[in-house]
Amino acid sequence: MSNKVVCVTGASGYIASWLVKLLLQRGYTVKASVRNPNDPTKTEHLLALDGAKERLQLFKADLLEEGSFDSAVEGCEGVFHTASPFYHDVTDPKAELLDPAVKGTLNVLNSCSKSPSIKRVVLTSSIAAVAYNGKPRTPDVVVDETWFTDPDVCKESKLWYVLSKTLAEDAAWKFVKEKGIDMVTINPAMVIGPLLQPTLNTSAAAILNIIKGARTYPNASFGWINVKDVANAHVQAFEIPSASGRYCLVERVAHFTEVLQIIHELYPDLQLPEKCSDDKPFVPTYQVSKEKAKSLGIEFIPLDISLKETIESLKEKSIVSF
């Protein structure tokens, strides 16, 4: 058990909530930042966690408000920076996504640079910052931590979320090099599994959409990973002294057709979409290396279990009923 003090930013989020849960379980004192500590949908599920009464402190902080993380990170040994904007339909990508992602990350790291107690920062990045380098991705291609997304590829294809994660991670590495901060990044793909927070998150919404009467399924192949593995990887990346650099987290890459097949086997009575959203050839799958992630002790919960946990969780929260 640990009696260390750590900070989790964006603590009400999907990954962060699980991270707070694991940290409290392990005996940490957690300073958790949220944008609005007075909003019960953002804090109630955190305050209900085991150990929260004794060891969870909430702080108000905003990604774009300079210095607003100073008090949250002060006196901490570790900082887990998970807060980041995520929208699909953006009208003004620069204002809505790019600036907040980069400025927010640098704002948190700047607060960290003022606190001498901090031993390591663990940054929640994304496979988005890894895999889009213009190289074709096919079933025999293995994406690993040496890949870096090319911002020009993102701009050409208008992949604004991908660009935001890429620029934020890149800015973070430059900043920590300059300031001598020890940082590790976790780069998960589509994160699914049980929800602790009461509101729907983006990746669970993708599953909800296909089980709740969507006419078509997307022509897309994604890497999939369980939220519990992602939260655990963050903890291990902080606790294991030799952890360094980036860690891709993907249990497997699957096209939506495979995802639907698994859901059909789990829930044979569910009406699922049978038609693809376009007539193009299916986007091929690819591989993502697990070597580094395994060095953190991650054993990878299989996709079928992750899908079942996601759907059972959506039912439990009455977000879907069947």
UniProtKB/Swiss-Prot annotation:
One of its GO terms (molecular function) is oxidoreductase activity, acting on the CH-OH group of donors, NAD or NADP as acceptor. It is an enzyme of class 1 (oxidoreductase). It holds the Pfam family Epimerase. NADP(+) binds at K42, Y161. Keywords: NADP, Oxidoreductase. Highly expressed in petals. Expressed in calyxes and leaves. It catalyses: 2-phenylacetaldehyde + NADPH + H(+) = 2-phenylethanol + NADP(+); 2-phenylacetaldehyde + NADH + H(+) = 2-phenylethanol + NAD(+). The keyword Transmembrane does not apply. Its EC number is 1.1.1.-. The keyword Magnesium does not apply. PANTHER family: CINNAMOYL-COA REDUCTASE CAD2 (PTHR10366:SF852), NAD DEPENDENT EPIMERASE/DEHYDRATASE (PTHR10366). Belongs to the NAD(P)-dependent epimerase/dehydratase family. Dihydroflavonol-4-reductase subfamily. Catalyzes the reduction of 2-phenylethylamine to produce 2-phenylethanol, a constituent of floral scent in petals. This is Phenylacetaldehyde reductase. The lineage of its organism: Eukaryota, Viridiplantae, Streptophyta, Embryophyta, Tracheophyta. The gene is PAR.
